[in-house]
């Protein structure tokens, strides 16, 4: 009763109305210094809450990834839409290093001195380790040169590669027209090279880039975190900065590897 009288004397009838009992503070609230660091890392690296959690652990800061997600949502640093994920019931068979390596080509968005360049990408499905190189064309010779360099530089033996149905990778749709014997179509130079090296060459189904999911996802990472944030004025500068970016990628923790980096996954 004394609180009602005090409120009535102070605010009149307005003081007797019901008010929110929500607490004005919380004993376990995240410190403002940690919140500012989370926001800073999000704007700088544009990573998800789980990867930000690992980055903070490297700095000696322990915060649950759900707490980080709530902070990002409160600050408006998350996307405004949700994607519905379809969960299929299947048995995931772990792959060995080099068992399947996905290879694809990405157009460099920015022309240099009026010329178009192309990024060849190879990524190991088991460890997510990858290798990049820039070419001034994406023909058969570039594909073969890239595969030869990949074999020499990869820290594992490549048993099979997987590509799309581009003319720089296969003759699946053009070999019959170029061959005098339709029942024995001419093989693509890359297929002949794979036979010489003892490498199996898999092809994805037409119109199914999802079957090359690892390399397609890495290309999205390149677009969002390298090409959209990096400026280069010459071919040499592009190659240098791309090499640094790929080194950072191979030393970045991945959710698909349970927090390991591709270089760490190679040791297991």
Q: How would you label these PLM feature ranges?
A:
Residues 8:
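DNA major-groove recognition helices of helix-turn-helix
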Residues 136-140, 177:
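A short acidic/small-residue loop/turn micro-motif
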Residues 1-4, 12, 37-38, 52, ...:
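Mobile genetic element proteins and their domesticated derivatives, centered on retroelements
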Residues 62, 66, 73, 77-123, ...:
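Mobile-element integrase/transposase regions
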Residues 163-165, 177-224, 243, 265-266:
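RNase H-like two-metal-ion nuclease catalytic core shared by retroviral integrases
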